[in-house]
Amino acid sequence: MTSAASGSGPVELTDPVPVKPRMRGWLHAGMFPAVVIAGITLIVLADSTRARIACAVYVLSACLLFGVSGVYHRGTWGPRGEAVLRRLDHANIFLIIAGTYTPLTLLLLPESTSQPLMWAIWGAAAAGIAFRVFWVGAPRWLYTPCYIAMGWAAVFFLPDFMRTGGIAVLVLVVVGGLLYSVGGVIYGLKRPNPSPRWFGFHEVFHSLTLAAFIVHYVGISLVAYQQ
């Protein structure tokens, strides 16, 4: 805040409040009902009880991601509401990573491997959620790499994914991961920022998360339907 003198005395000048691009939040808000419908379809058509439970975890994490993001980014909130929703929005990124790993790990890996990996992934997600909840003001350069690193934590199991799920599943998992990663880099750098008034860097990031979810959804569907 600065002050300036005029003929009538000092005038307080406040710093301008950043204006959200007009498309902020619409992509995720619009995606939410589609995720609900697609998620129910995935759960119902899954070939086994194990697959249905694993897919339900994945679908729930996706609904939270897109639903909370849509509410947070479309609304105008006071300081307290802003802080709560921002914490939930950022924490849900760790949740969707673990949720995506759940059907892939439980349905493509043997029990001896899937159980330790599930503990590791969900333990990392719990730590990440606590990190974002209790340190919501952490710098982007710190927490963004955490998202990306956790997303690729099971890279050494990709050959196992291919052996059990096939080359199509492997390609879809990798492509989805790359889309999420590119989105994370754009979010961290705030570049490119094509149209700050309409469609900024955050909308590019949301577009890539949406595309990544669709790619992973197709891959997980292939896995769930062949159990």
Label for each model-derived stretch:
Residues 1-227:
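Multi-pass alpha-helical transmembrane bundles in non-GPCR membrane proteins
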